[in-house]
Amino acid sequence: MTQQPLPTRTEEISPTRKSTPWSRYEEAVLGFRNYWYPAMLSRHLRRKPVAVQLLGEKLVFVRSQGKCYALENRCPHRGVPLSMGTCEFPGTHTITCRYHGWTFDLSDGLCVAAITDGPESSIVGKVRVSSYPVEERKGLIWVFIGDRQPPPFEEDVPEDILDEKAVLGIRLTQRIGNWRLA
């Protein structure tokens, strides 16, 4: 059995060709998106929304009644970061944009109110921001920003991390640069 040599450049991979060991790497312009990623320490998410940028995505994390949520950090109305917003209506699992009061459901990103437009607003139920699956484990908040259904968390994260007896040493650093060269 003979093996074909691997292509040396992305352009040489035809769309009809089966994947190569490097295909996923070459296609991952902004990183490997279809995985669970640790986004922040659980203790850093309290009452106020927190902005995080991960793999080129600007996210906002919100804790509502003890549960964590992640949304796109951009109000579709004027582009204001939702991380500047507030949870105006306790118990409703929503975040409200500070600029014009558009309010989004934390579970699915759907606009549920437009405070400045009143209860008859035509945008309610029609506009949404992206929402992302979140898991909180071992003192970390994990997020899946892929373009498909997330795999079960336990199957995607190394089992050593989930071991109850394991102690995680965590260091936070911000890296700006090309992830492929890191």
What does each model-identified segment do?
Residues 6, 40-167:
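Rieske [2Fe-2S] iron-sulfur-binding domain
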Residues 35-43, 167-176:
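Short amphipathic
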Residues 179-181:
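Glycine-rich, aromatic-lined ligand/substrate-binding cores of catalytic
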